[in-house]
Amino acid sequence: TVMLLHGLSSDATSYMRFTSIERYAESHQLAIIMPNADHSAYANMAYGHRYYDYILEVYHYVHQIFPLSTRREDNFIAGHSMGGYGTMKFALTQSHLFSKAAPMSAVFQAQTLIDLEWTDYHPQAITGEHTNVKGTNLDTYHLVDAAVAREETLPELFIQCGTEDFLYQDNLTFIDYLADKQIPYRFEPSPGAHDYTYWDKSIARALAWFVND
């Protein structure tokens, strides 16, 4: 089973509309869970819904009503852009649920999400009065440090990013940090921008990796 998280400009229907996710999932015999998280950064918002908790509720509810394995080795998580950020967040904080995680074109510097200007997007709804998220549970680097301190077995990581993506350098900086912390990862850059042309290819690679290696 794959928990698949959408990006800031997308919703729970986007992978069905803009990629061949159904065909890929069928070929690998995978169930795909696609929750909607609006513009939440997959966080428990200061002013808004508790989307972090909601994603976990969806995970457990779907596993209750469908005959899906709850074994860690049978459950994976992936997502792009804001969803890649969410993927990394859950990989680092809910490592007992997922054996593999595949962030694609991910936002690893949470401040990027907070500083971003987007239609109907209000980052203060996520952070409240705080404008700097460094050292908080929104900070991916802080979550890496916390996971290392807990000495947890983290999911295997397959990180992908297009070389023409505006987040490419962000990805390079983050994998350097993972290396410094001795956290294993696989990084696969390839030509592509921040769009569904790239994510159609990257999600196909991610699903194949989940089931084959």
Protein language model annotation of sequence segments:
Residues 1-213:
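Non-catalytic cap/lid and distal C-terminal segments of serine-dependent acyl enzymes
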